[in-house]
Amino acid sequence: MYSEMDLYCKLFVETQLDRAALVRFVAQTVTGTENRSTIVSPWGEVDVRNNDDYNEDRAADPHDGFLFYRYYLDIEPVEDADPGEYILSIAQLLEALWKSGAKAVAACDFEEELPRKGGMAGE
């Protein structure tokens, strides 16, 4: 089922946390180890990046505003990661971000398998 699927995922995140706090939050959520702005977990690597396209006004657009959120997370599986576990872990990260009050939207080939279709389906 997953053999042909690209497992790269980009999560756009809008939060009041600064980047260092977001890195800590993600590391705790995914039970990972921090190395500057990269978190390594048993299932994947997460890079927390500032979004060069960040624009507070454009981020409010209900259709594609997520493209202008303050941060994005580049997420890739580690070698030999189980695809099902990897996708479930991203789903759990999304849920934790939403629960914290952050806005988060996933852009990946498996959005349909994530809660709220990766954040595009609203509440």
Identify the function of each model-found stretch:
Residues R19-L22, E79-E85:
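Short, surface-exposed beta-strand/loop "edge" segments at domain boundaries and coil↔beta transitions
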Residues K10-F12, D47, R70-D74, K103-A107:
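Ordered hydrophobic segments in well-structured contexts
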Residues T33-D82:
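Short, intrinsically disordered low-complexity segments
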Residues M1-G32:
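Short, extreme N-terminal segment that most often corresponds to the first beta-strand
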Residues A91-E123:
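Acidic, proline/glycine-rich low-complexity IDRs
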Residues F12-L17, E76-V78, F110:
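Structural motif
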Residues M1-Y8, P62-D74, E79, E113-E123:
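Intrinsic low-complexity, intrinsically disordered or marginally ordered coil/linker segments
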Residues P83-L93:
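Well-ordered, non-membrane alpha-helical segments in soluble/globular domains
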